[in-house]
């Protein structure tokens, strides 16, 4: 037995139990490895057909298998035996890959004491088998047996986490992370094979109708929306759909969202993609050009994220401007529910203030009236700096 370099048992515990806040993370990390391996091979042959097979066995062992580029013996030594080494970080195609830190495989040690990786490289060489243990030791053997190009990872779950490997629970986790990944994912259970993802989701289809987007959003978020509109940003390459909530929201309440990074689910928070005033918006977006933190649970706060947020803010304002000009009925529906938020937008944008002003409602001594109605009634408008209270 040999020991993983630059690590001790405590280092593995730190990475596997403290960087990753959710025990389900191992599914995401293994799917990410599969996707990146296939992407690496498709960068050589763009017509290559990749697929991912996940086997949930009766003894609750789980196998993740891909037909991607695979690993040679020297690559196993370099990338599996040194914490923090990644085969993807410094390559010319690094932007195509989801992972880049070289620590994701360690998330498996949250749910297992042993990880087995079997691989055959598309670049040649003998098949290899690497078996790593939670105490930091590993064994590496070569095989003369024929095996297909690609890799498979085998996990034997710890007793405390057996419930994650129950069929319905495991399938839900697998779908959550892998639903829109670009390669087909098949779940194998009790001799049956099931496709669990949609490589071409409707919300990434530029030809999707408003109704299709609204129906999909209602299914995903278990809540209807007033309206839906598509966005795309040059900075960060953020693409997807923004939904207008059908109920009034508080500035302090955080709504649920779905943010994907290179089509892998990253977070159900907005990850600071939305402007601070956009509390009436729910986002379903994918970012191909932004960076994740090491835990892959949020986005790195940098100039790219800041610029993407600005572009999304402009897109929301353009959407509202378009409604005023082309769909006054929808604008009025949104205004009825979200006039506080629209006032907040108008207060920081003089152009929108002039555009929206006559439609914005204000409390008066004659009830709630639009500013246009107030202005047309008198040339003199008196106002208070505190909330109006009618005294009887």
Q: Predicted regions span which residues?
A:
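Residue-level detector of conserved catalytic or cofactor/ligand-binding positions
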Residues: 1-6, 386, 390-392
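GHKL (Bergerat-fold) ATPase N-terminal catalytic module, capturing the glycine-rich phosphate-binding loop
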Residues: 1-165
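GHKL/Bergerat-fold ATPase module in large chromosome/replication-associated machines
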Residues: 97, 117-139, 158-163, 168-391
């Amino acid at each position: 037995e040999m020991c993983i370099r630059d690590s001790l048992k405590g280092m593995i515990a730190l990475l596997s139990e403290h960087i990753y806040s959710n025990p389900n993370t191992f599914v995401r990390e293994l799917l990410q490895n599969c996707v990146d391996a296939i992407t690496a091979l498709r960068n050589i042959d763009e017509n290559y057909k990749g697929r991912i097979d996940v086997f949930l066995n009766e003894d609750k062992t789980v196998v993740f298998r891909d037909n991607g580029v695979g690993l040679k013996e020297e690559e196993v030594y370099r990338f599996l035996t040194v914490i923090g080494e990644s085969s993807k970080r410094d390559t010319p195609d690094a932007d195509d890959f989801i992972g880049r830190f070289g620590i994701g495989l360690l998330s498996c040690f949250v749910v297992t004491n042993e990880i087995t990786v079997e691989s055959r490289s598309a670049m040649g060489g003998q098949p290899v088998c690497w078996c790593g243990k939670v105490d930091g030791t590993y064994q590496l053997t070569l095989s003369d047996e024929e095996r297909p190009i690609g890799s498979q990872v085998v996990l034997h779950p710890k007793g405390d986490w057996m419930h994650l490997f129950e069929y319905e629970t495991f399938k839900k986790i697998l779908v959550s992370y892998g639903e829109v990944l670009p390669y087909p994912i098949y779940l194998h259970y009790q001799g049956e094979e099931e496709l669990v993802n949609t490589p071409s989701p409707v919300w990434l289809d530029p030809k999707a109708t408003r109704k299709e987007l609204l129906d999909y959003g209602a299914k995903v978020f278990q809540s209807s929306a007033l309206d839906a509109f598509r966005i795309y940003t040059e900075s960060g390459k953020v693409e997807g759909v923004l939904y207008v909530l059908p109920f009034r929201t508080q500035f302090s309440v955080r709504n649920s969202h779905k943010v994907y990074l290179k089509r892998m689910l990253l977070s159900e928070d907005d990850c600071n993609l939305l402007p601070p005033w956009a509390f009436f918006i729910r986002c379903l977006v994918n970012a191909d050009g932004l960076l994740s933190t090491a835990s892959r649970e949020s986005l790195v706060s940098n100039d790219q994220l800041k610029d993407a947020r600005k572009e999304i803010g402009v897109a929301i304002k353009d959407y509202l401007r378009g409604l005023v000009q082309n769909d006054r009925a929808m604008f009025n529906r949104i205004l009825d529910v979200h006039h506080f938020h629209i006032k907040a937008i108008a207060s920081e944008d003089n152009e929108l203030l002039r555009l929206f002003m006559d439609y914005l409602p204000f409390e008066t001594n004659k009830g709630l009236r639009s500013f246009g109605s107030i202005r047309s009634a008198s040339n003199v408008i008196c106002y208070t700096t505190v909330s109006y209270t009618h005294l009887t």
